Every structure is written in C-alpha cells, then in structure tokens.
Swiss-Prot record:
Subunit structure: Homodimer.
Ranges where the Radical SAM core domain occurs: 31-210
Role: Catalyzes the complex heterocyclic radical-mediated conversion of 6-carboxy-5,6,7,8-tetrahydropterin (CPH4) to 7-carboxy-7-deazaguanine (CDG), a step common to the biosynthetic pathways of all 7-deazapurine-containing compounds.
Enzyme class: lyase
Family (UniProt): Belongs to the radical SAM superfamily. 7-carboxy-7-deazaguanine synthase family.
Keywords, alphabetical: 4Fe-4S, Iron, Iron-sulfur, Lyase, Magnesium, Metal-binding, Queuosine biosynthesis, S-adenosyl-L-methionine
Pfam families to which the protein is assigned, alphabetical: Fer4_12, Radical_SAM
Residues that, per the record, bind S-adenosyl-L-methionine: 86, 127-129
Name of the protein in its database record: 7-carboxy-7-deazaguanine synthase
Length: 210
C-alpha cells in the first residue's frame, strides 16, 4: 500500500512506476539501428492480447521511483532516451521530460496514444490499438505511425489510422512477432503496392538484445 505522500508524488510525476531501464539498440521503426536508453514505465489498461510485455500492465508491481533518479541514470548513456511501457501516458510525463531535456537529451516516446498527451517530445511514435483508440492530439503530433499487423484485417485498420494522422507522419507496418512468418510476406507485398508505407522489423529480437 502506497503512502499518501508517494501517491501524490506519482500523480504529479515526481515519481513513476519504473519497470525497467536499459541501454540498447533501437529495434523498430524510424530509428532502427541507433543507440538509445529505454525507460519502461509500468501500467497499461489497453490490453492487447498479443502484448510481449504483459508484465508491465499492473503498475502496482513496479515500485514508484523518483524521477530525478530515473534521469540521473539516463544521463550515463546515450543522448537519445525512449520512454515506453506499458502505456507511459497513463502518467503525467511533464516532469520527466522537462528534466531529461534539461540534460540536453533527445526524448522519444512509444505510445498507443490512448491517453491525453503530457510531456514535451522530440519524437512521438504512435502505435494505435483497436481496443482503445488514440486521442485527437496524438494523431496531430505523431512523427511516426507504427501499426502492428496480427492478421489481414489489420491492414484495413492501418489505413483507417493513416487517414487520421498528420500528413508528415512516417508510416510503418510491423508484424506481431508470433505471426512474423505468416504475415511478413503480406506486409512486403502490401508495402510494394502501397509505397507510402514502410516495413518495420523487430530487429532487436533477431539480434537477441533487449
């Protein structure tokens, strides 16, 4: 049971339920192949059945950590920070992003966009989910739209989402990992016939890195 003081700190973004943090090579989307420090925040109620980090869903399993400590750890590694989850926008990201930027770090987010946008982001990767669609602002500010393809019906969803996102967003299709053998050929064919899209692969899993 969290104390009232800790609950207030979490609500303000002075503390966040930190699941894990690690330095690695980005494996997906526009920044594939570049070094980045990942901050994974616990808590998500979007509930994708194919989620590969279901252990992140219950925020209560991840101890509230002072934002200053998270930032101090991040400064030891790359100049690019990726905030992911879970669903990081479940929480107020204002304090975290302010303090990361004060250290002259580039701050990226990977989000479903299902919650109001807080924080200041240098790169906003929107990965929408059918269960809980993005808020309007997420479509407006997204630098990158990454749609996960689990079955052929997801191509329809991808086009629906592409129609909502701003015209400058870069569009990616990425197979759900357990379906990669089945769906990747369809994705390749789709991108060749619809070249506004790009293929995203989970290269970190091929490289066996976090």
């Amino acid at each position: 049971m969290l104390t009232k003081e800790i609950q207030i700190a979490v609500e303000k973004g002075e503390m966040l339920p930190l699941m894990e943090e690690f330095y690695t090579i980005q494996g997906e989307g526009y920044h594939t192949g570049t070094a980045a420090y990942f901050i994974r925040i616990g808590g998500c109620d979007v509930g994708c059945h194919w989620c590969d980090v279901k252990e992140s869903w219950n925020a209560a399993l991840h101890p509230p950590t002072k934002t200053d400590v998270i930032v101090e750890n991040a400064t030891k590694y790359a100049k690019t920070i990726v905030v992911t989850g879970g669903e990081p926008l479940t929480w107020d990201m204002t304090v975290l992003t302010q303090r990361l930027k004060a250290e002259n770090l580039q701050v990226h987010i990977e989000t479903s966009g299902a919650y109001p946008v807080t924080g200041a982001w240098d790169w906003f990767c929107l990965s929408p989910k059918k269960n809980k669609l993005p808020v309007a602002e997420a479509y407006e500010i997204a630098h990158e739209l990454k749609v996960i393809i689990y079955n052929k019906h997801d191509f329809i969803f991808a086009e629906e989402q592409a129609a909502k996102v701003n015209k400058n967003a870069i569009l990616f299709l990425q197979s759900e990992w357990s379906k990669k053998e089945e769906m990747t050929p369809f994705i390749v064919d789709y991108v060749m016939n619809n070249p506004k899209w790009r293929v995203s692969l989970q290269t970190h899993k091929y490289l066996n890195i976090p």
